[in-house]
Every structure is written in C-alpha cells, then in structure tokens.
Amino acid sequence: MTASERELIKETVADFVEREIRPAAAEADETQTFPEDVWDGLAELDLTGLTVSEEYGGFDADQVTYSVINEELARGDLSVATALSVHCLATACIERFGTDEHKSEWLPEMVNGRPVGAFALSEPDAGSNPREMTTEARREGDEYVINGKKQWITNGKRAGVIVLFAKTDRDDPDSITQFLVPKGTDGLEVGKKEDKLGLRASDTTSLRFDGARIPEENRLTEVGSGLKAAFSILTGGRIAIASQAVGVAEAALRDAIEYADEREQFGKPIADHQAISHKLADMATDVRAARLLTRDAAEKNEDGVDPMAASMAKYFASETAVDVANEAVQVHGGYGYTKDFDVERYYRDAKITTIYEGTSEIQKEIISRHL
C-alpha cells in the first residue's frame, strides 16, 4: 500500500471518529454500554475484516495501516478500538491456523461484523504465564469436552464465537491447543460484566466451561501448538495496543493544547505561561516518539515477527499514554477532574494499556531477553 493510499484511509477513519465515535464516547462510558451502531459503522467501512484476506471479503491491511487505524479509533474511544482489535485477533487466528472449512464458515460473516470474535487465553490464576492455565479440552471420541474458566475476556457477552486456548491434558503444559467455541454451546456460561476503572463501554467478562462439548473439527491448531500460535498472533496484537495507546495520548494532547489556548489566567492564555508551554512540549515529544517507535515495530512485523520491537513499542507507548493523560488532567486543573471534560476518561482508560496483552513488566522481560 502506498503512503497516499494509507493517508486516504486514515482520513476516512478520522472522519468516522469525529462524526460517530467521539460524540458517543462519553455516554457509552457513563452507561457502560457498547455502541453497537458504531460497530455497524465499522463493518460498513470494512474495518471488522482488517486481518482477513480479500479471498474471504476482508480488508487485508498491512501492519502499518493496521497501526494507523487502531490509533485513530482509540483517539475517539479506546473501548471501541479494543473491541475491534480483539475481534481482529480472533479473525487472524482463524485465517492463519484454520482449515479452509473454518475460514469459509466463519470469516465472511465476521468480516461483516457478526458474529463478533473473542480471544480466551487468560485465566484467574494464569495471566502473565499462560502455561499455568488449567482449562482442559479432553478428547472423547470425535468431540472435545471442555472444563475450566477464562478471565478478562473482551467481547465476552457480545461474542458469537470464541477462540479458546486449553490443554488437552491438564497436567501437560505443552498440550495447549487452540479451539473454536460458538456462542450458545451447552456448558458455556458467560460471567457478569466487570465494573472497571476505564474501558467501561467494552464488555469484559469471565467464561466458564462446564462439560462444554465441541466437535473435533473445531480444533484450530495441532495439539500442543496453541501457545506458539498465540504468541505469534500477540506480537501483532501488542503493536495494535501500542497504536491505541498513542491514540489515547494524542487525544489527551490535543485537548490539553485546546484548553491551554482558551483558558486565561493572570491576563493571558495559560499556554503562554512557560510552566504550561513546556509541559505541552514534553507531552508532544513523548507522543511523537511513541508513534515513531510503534510504526517502526509495525514495519518490522511486516517483514517478520520481531518480538523485541513490538514489546518496546507496547511498553513505551502505554506508559506514555498514562503520563500524557495525567498531564492533560493537570493542564485542565480542577475541570480535568470532572466528567465534563474528556481528559478524565482518557486518564482512566490509559492505564489498561499498560496491563492487557502483556503488562509493562512482561514487555521489559521480553526486551531484556532479546538484548
């Protein structure tokens, strides 16, 4: 894709963000309700098929374009961007590891926005170390019987299909395998929606499997290949989260600049006071550095998986989002501590980018191992 084509896509998404996403974000956050009409709009723009090839009607975005789109969406509402990126994780798994039958059955409809996809890897006692998962998919004849619990599942209630990671032998950490579990499967129970600090419009739930049965053909990967598959997918996922973190930081920066230009104290705009102007300069520099690091990781991932570049981007961009959102609240003073201004939401939303799809601490572990 050429730079001019990518810029046109960015402008199209940015226009949708301004018209549809940003106006709905505050209410969606307040009511903890996902804006389904926005999701339908994403589907109309073909964004629900970002990681799907053209063969199945998808957008087939390259890594840099995927990064640009994630940044723009998160600038409008991180909840929407997160829901889409997890849906795209699910479609990427089906595209990369599924059979032709899997792809034909699921991808064309998922490209059109329904069913929504979920990605079930984390568990209550197995977050940063998935090898400790206890969910088991035991083979019985031509079926797998699933027992266990998953935690922190984005799109948990909305999902029509779940990409599930489970051990075929609970005592064997090398037996982790990837499966497809459709909504409505007997023995699958979706837990209550988590009441979170931020990302409140995105539904995050637990999933409980109690003797849930799926046919053998719903196995996506070879037995024991699920974790390797997950890590290969999550490298791109971390770049998406880094991009979203840049989007949140950019939104906070823009709002801070606008407020500083309008708010007057001591007879002039606060932007003309060095204490504020230098703060804005630091924020702008950090946002640009995070964006460049993230785009570099995306370019490297286009040529082949580069875990260190992805982890550097995810670590730096997410910490930048937290810092810039914090400073944006500070620029707004007391007003920034109220829901009347979006920086309050950015401040709450930014924190999750340092946690999901690998904490900042895990990113530093990955970086240090590759030095």
Give the location of each predicted region.
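A structural signal for short hydrophobic beta-strand segments in well-ordered beta-sheet cores
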Residues: T135-R138
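Alpha-helical interface subdomain recognition
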Residues: M1-G76, V80, F97-H102, E109, ...
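Flexible, small-/acidic-enriched active-site or ligand-binding loops
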Residues: E132, G184-R213
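Short Gly/Pro-enriched turn/cap motifs at secondary-structure boundaries
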Residues: M110, D125-S128, W152-N155, K167-R170, ...
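Helix-loop "lid/cap" segments that line or gate small-molecule binding pockets
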Residues: L89-F97
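A short, charged helix-loop
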Residues: R208-A229
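A short core secondary-structure module
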Residues: N147-V190
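A short, Trp-centered hydrophobic/proline-enriched beta-strand micro-motif
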Residues: G113-L121
